């Protein structure tokens, strides 16, 4: 079914206010959920909202909490999110990283006691729109087996890198072949995954999203490489924030909350002039996209460039929402 941006935001806003979230906070949070969905990231927008409400009701998310700065070391700061609303706090932390970068050339904010930030790409994009390189990542509860194991002991720990090219070039990727949100999107659409995304119950690689959602044997991106990246990203976020690791979140908490996140902004213009920057980026993009195609009907894409098109389509035609997901939203 199709809904408008206004319908989405109103539904989110109503659910938040009915649970005691103050009107200003509810409006800002609903806006971010609606913008994420409008951008085409349904898995971490409308599809994720019922789970967000569940954590709000369980007390994992403290809606009136505000992040607090703990340590300041010039270009590096350490903050405590105090289990505040994840997407609003992440936006504030990237804004702070940008402010630090404006003074120092680079800014790094390490955040502890955070909640799920929903679409991580929003914060990389936020930096790139202002002309900065944006880098951020988060740890999570253990939802992926390390390479060679059956049992979940590492996080999907998504990493975002956004470049201020025209259009913005951005990688937003979990350390698994697919996020659990994308498994859900494909299952709801009745689609197999385009490539193997995990193991079935017999230990064979499978493209069936529902099987992987159930047994949680999701495949690390690049096999052992994604497994290793997940571990080191967790270590860095834990150390710099003095926060909880994947092991601590999984073993000590009843759900995924109190996680650790990193936000980095780099002011490119302190290192290279604008025309030179633009020319170098354009040459990279042209060199990649003019490679001989393996399939003449399949264009060579650059990461993140599809979001501008998706946003325009959703604004023109309405936002596609799965019927069952919309029913859940309406029932909240």
Swiss-Prot record:
State where the protein is found.
Cytoplasm
This protein's record includes keyword NADP: no
* UniProt main location, coarse: cytoplasm
Extract one GO cellular component term from the record. cytoplasm
Question: Known EC number(s)?
Answer: 1.1.1.130
Which superkingdom does the taxonomy of this entry point to?
Bacteria
| Claim: DNA-binding is one of the keywords in the record | no
One Pfam entry for this protein is: Ldh_2
GO MF terms held by the record: 3-dehydro-L-gulonate 2-dehydrogenase activity; NAD+ binding
- Keyword annotations for this protein? Cytoplasm, NAD, Oxidoreductase
Q: Check the record and name the InterPro entries matching this protein.
A: Diketo_gul_Rdtase, Mal/L-sulf/L-lact_DH-like_ah, Mal/L-sulf/L-lact_DH-like_NADP, Mal/L-sulfo/L-lacto_DH-like_sf, Malate/L-lactate_DH-like
| HAMAP family membership | Diketo_gul_reduc
**Record-stated family:** Belongs to the LDH2/MDH2 oxidoreductase family. DlgD subfamily.
Please identify the protein, giving its name as recorded.
2,3-diketo-L-gulonate reductase
